[in-house]
């Protein structure tokens, strides 16, 4: 599948999963923003979601956690988006990962148990499944992460 088609499939899957959870989702016009979707969290504000496709590697889901290089180098999404909406095509699973939880070049979510039973500093995929995110948990991201985005009146 072409890169653009993969991105479109991920965006559609994340959009569908968010709408299924009765969340209001806005889709920005054009490709000029560093995020693909915006989720309204009333009355707090809005969360920006960057959609990514994950692949399986070494018992983990791996996704690109940097922006596309447009002559500026590959930059982190910190301050540009709030969440990664991560889609894993083989299982059609969607995960929501706060950008602050994936600040390296790649985001890693562990699917398989670690060989040494380590849990510290391991991000288990099950903890980020979209089904685990309540409206209160999403609102907590706004309160903890940054000032809420507000639409002009």
Which functions belong to the PLM regions below?
Residues 1-33, 38-153:
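Mixed-charge (Asp/Glu-Lys/Arg
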């Amino acid at each position: 599948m072409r890169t653009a088609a993969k991105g479109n499939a991920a965006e559609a899957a994340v959009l569908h999963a968010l709408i299924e959870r009765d969340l209001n989702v806005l889709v920005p016009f054009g490709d000029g923003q560093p995020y693909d979707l915006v989720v309204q969290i009333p009355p707090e504000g809005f969360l920006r979601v960057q959609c990514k496709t994950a692949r399986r590697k070494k018992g983990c889901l791996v996704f690109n956690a940097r922006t596309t290089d447009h002559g500026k180098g590959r930059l982190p999404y910190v301050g540009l988006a709030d969440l990664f909406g991560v889609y894993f095509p083989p299982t059609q699973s969607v995960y929501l990962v706060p950008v602050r939880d994936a600040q390296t070049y790649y985001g890693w979510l562990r699917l398989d148990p670690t060989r040494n039973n380590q849990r510290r500093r391991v991000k288990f995929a099950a903890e980020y499944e979209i089904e685990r995110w309540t409206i209160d948990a999403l609102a907590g991201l706004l309160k903890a992460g940054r000032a809420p985005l507000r639409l002009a009146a």
